[in-house]
C-alpha cells in the first residue's frame, strides 16, 4: 500500500487512507 493524497483516503476509508493494489489512486 502507498500513502497517497485525498483520493486514497476517499477510496480506502477502511485502510485509513492506505492505497491497495486494487485501488485506483
UniProtKB/Swiss-Prot annotation:
Gene Ontology terms: cellular component: extracellular region
GO BP field: defense response to bacterium; defense response to fungus; killing of cells of another organism
Location in the cell: Secreted, Cell wall
Annotated keywords: Antibiotic, Antimicrobial, Cell wall, Fungicide, Plant defense, Secreted
Chief place of localization: secreted
Tree of life domain: Eukaryota
Expressed in which tissues: Distributed in the epidermal cell layer of leaves and in the subepidermal layer region of stems. Not in roots.
Role according to the record: Antimicrobial peptide. Active against Fusarium spp., Gram-positive and Gram-negative bacterial pathogens.
Family according to the record: Belongs to the DEFL family. Group IV subfamily.
The protein's name in its UniProt record: Defensin D3
Organism, scientific name: Spinacia oleracea (Spinach)
Organism ancestry: Eukaryota, Viridiplantae, Streptophyta, Embryophyta, Tracheophyta
